[in-house]
Every structure is written in structure tokens, then in C-alpha cells.
A protein has these predicted regions:
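Phosphate-binding site of ATP-dependent enzymes
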Residues: 145-226, 247-254
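Glycine-rich phosphate/pyrophosphate-binding beta-alpha loops
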Residues: 65, 138, 193, 259-273
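ATP-binding N-terminal substructure of ATP-dependent carboxylate-amine bond-forming enzymes
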Residues: 1-103, 107, 119, 290-300
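Active-site nucleotide/adenylate-binding loops and adjacent lid/helix of ATP-dependent enzymes
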Residues: 1-12, 40, 48-54, 94-173
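Active-site "cap" helix and flanking loop/linker of ATP-utilizing ligase/carboxylase catalytic domains
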Residues: 189-241, 272-302
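Conserved metal-phosphate-binding beta-hairpin within the catalytic cores
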Residues: 168, 232-264, 274
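A glycine- and small-aliphatic-rich helix-loop capping segment at beta-alpha/alpha-beta transitions
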Residues: 75-84, 146-151, 276-277
């Protein structure tokens, strides 16, 4: 079925700390699909049990964070027999758990920053990154370079509801590679005007400079694209993802995480990478629908 003949439910909002960003992603996707002639309905998800409108052919998932991105929603939709965009329940759950994802990617030979589960007794000397095991949009992330910063981070982590992890700090360029279908999009470099690429810098206009394609040798760009595809496949991801990297001054890159429902706002990285590859936002959304529908019908990516 062509996207123009589908009835699409754009699911956004959700119950996580990323609700506002999810709403912005959903609104942007809905606007883009509408401009391409797709029949759609926007669904503001407000609980951990979604109600899909009658007659829906496929759900376009824009739910970032817990419930929408951790495999729970995907499992519910599988039970309903409802088609949806992106990775399945198992891959979504795996990618959302950063420690489990590290284990799998490490076993696949993918370069990673060293990381372990964090407790107050299981601590390192600075520098390091302290962050939630399962969260997105850099919520709850602390960069620790001094003992004073470490104490502040420990206090904040003690108030966080979920498990935390500690990771070696890699100083260098912040990079990302989007995957759509089987294609790795051009590398994007993000350069925040202050600090690192945290929640404020991600979603505040003018706070970050985006370089796409990133200024690097062609061979290095191809290397990162191949690493991104390898990470995507190692976790069993399908249709789309965004793989985040850090690269030091010597050109050594490590994978930080794989995002199975990347942001789709006007400031988001996947749409920017699509533009650099000659894919405008409307056609990017259509591709995601087409690939997801084919997967649902055939069990494979067409």
C-alpha cells in the first residue's frame, strides 16, 4: 500500500520526561505527511495504554522516552496486530537500556566508551559521565571533571528514580549518523555554543551549530557510517535509528548509544541529515512509512 492510500495515526506526547519534545516531533511529522497528501489523525498519548483510532492502517511513532521507545508500546501494537514505524519491541527495549546495549555492541566488536552500573559505592575518579541507564534527550546527564562536580552529580543521581550508569568521558567532537531503511545518512557534527549537547542545547534555537556533512575526510565519514550500520544491526534495529558518537582529537570514535525513535522536530538531527542526502522532510517521512509497511507485510525490509 502506498502512503497516500494509508490512514496513518501519528502517536505523540506520552508520559515520559520527553513529552514536550515528542509533541513537537509529532506535529512536525503530521504537517509533513499532510503536505504529501497522506490521510492522518494525530493522537496525543496521555497514559501507558494507547487507543488507536478505528480504521488506522499504520501508526507513526513519535513517542520519545519510556513507554514509547522502550518496547512497551511496540509490544502492545504487536498484540493488536497493528503496523507501526521503526524497530520492534525486542530491539527497542535493548537499545533503550544503555548497559545491555553496550554488552551487545561490545560483543559485536563496536568501539565503546567504558561504562558500568553506578552506585554511591561503585564510583570512579573524574573525569566521567554520570547518566540514566534508560532515558533520552540527555535528561539527567552530568559531565564530571572535578570532585566538586562529582559531589553535585552524586546528589542529583540519588534523587533520580531509575538506575544510573557511569561512563568514561571522551573529550572530542559530538557526531551522529542517521539510518533510514538500509541507508546511512551523512555524518552530522553538533557544536553547542556552551557546554555539551544537553536538553537545552538540543531544543533551543541558536544554541547549537550543526555541520552536515561533518568536516572530515571522506574515508572517516564512511567509517562512521559503517559503524553506525553495524551498531543498528547488532541491536536488531529496523527502519530508522540515530547512532551517536564521540571522536577524540586523534580520530578515534566510540559509539555512545542508538536511538530507535530519534527526534523529528525542526531542530532534530535525522531530518538535517536527510536534507544533506537530498531527502526533504516530507519524503523522509514517506520513506519511513513505506519501509515500515513493507516490513509489516513481508516480515522483511523491502
Amino acid at each position: 500500500m502506498k502512503p497516500e492510500k494509508m490512514k496513518v495515526a501519528v502517536l505523540a506526547g506520552g508520559v515520559s520526561g520527553e513529552r514536550e519534545i515528542s509533541q513537537r516531533s509529532g506535529a512536525a511529522v503530521a504537517k509533513a505527511l499532510h503536505s504529501m497528501g497522506v490521510r492522518l489523525v494525530e493522537v496525543d498519548v496521555k497514559s501507558r495504554q494507547v487507543e488507536v483510532p478505528a480504521g488506522t492502517d499504520i501508526c507513526f511513532l513519535c513517542l520519545h522516552g519510556s513507554y514509547g521507545e522502550d518496547g512497551t508500546l511496540q509490544a502492545e501494537l504487536d498484540t493488536m496486530g497493528m503496523a507501526y514505524t521503526g524497530s520492534g519491541a525486542v530491539a527497542s527495549a535493548l537499545a533503550f537500556d544503555k548497559l545491555r546495549a553496550k554488552e551487545v555492541m561490545g560483543a559485536a566488536g563496536i568501539p565503546l566508551a567504558e561504562g558500568i552500573a553506578w552506585t554511591k559505592e561503585n564510583d570512579w575518579l573524574p573525569p566521567y559521565v554520570l547518566k540514566p541507564v534508560s532515558e533520552g534527550s540527555s535528561l539527567g546527564v552530568h559531565l564530571v571533571r572535578t570532585e566538586v562536580e562529582a559531589e553535585k552529580a552524586r546528589k542529583a543521581a540519588g534523587k533520580w528514580k531509575g538506575p544510573m550508569m557511569i561512563e568514561r568521558l571522551v573529550e572530542g567532537a559530538e557526531l551522529t549518523v542517521g539510518i533510514v531503511g538500509k541507508q546511512a545518512l551523512p555524518v552530522v557534527e553538533v557544536r553547542p555554543t556552551q557546554g555539551f549537547y544537553d536538553y537545552r542545547n538540543k531544543y533551543t534555537a541558536g544554541s547549537t551549530k550543526y555541520l552536515c556533512p561533518a568536516p572530515m575526510a571522506k574515508e572517516k565519514g564512511l567509517e562512521l557510517q559503517e559503524l553506525a550500520k553495524k551498531a543498528h544491526e547488532a541491536l536488531g534495529c529496523e527502519i530508522l535509528s540515530r547512532v551517536d558518537f564521540l571522536m577524540d582529537a586523534e580520530g578515534k570514535a566510540v559509539v555512545l548509544e542508538v536511538n530507535t525513535i530519534p527526534g523529528m522536530t525542526d531542530l532534530s538531527l535525522l531530518p538535517r541529515a536527510g536534507q544533506a542526502a537530498g531527502i526533504d522532510f516530507g519524503n523522509l517521512c514517506l520513506k519511513i512509512l513505506e519501509f515500515s509497511w513493507a516490513r509489516n507485510q513481508k516480515g522483511v525490509l523491502a
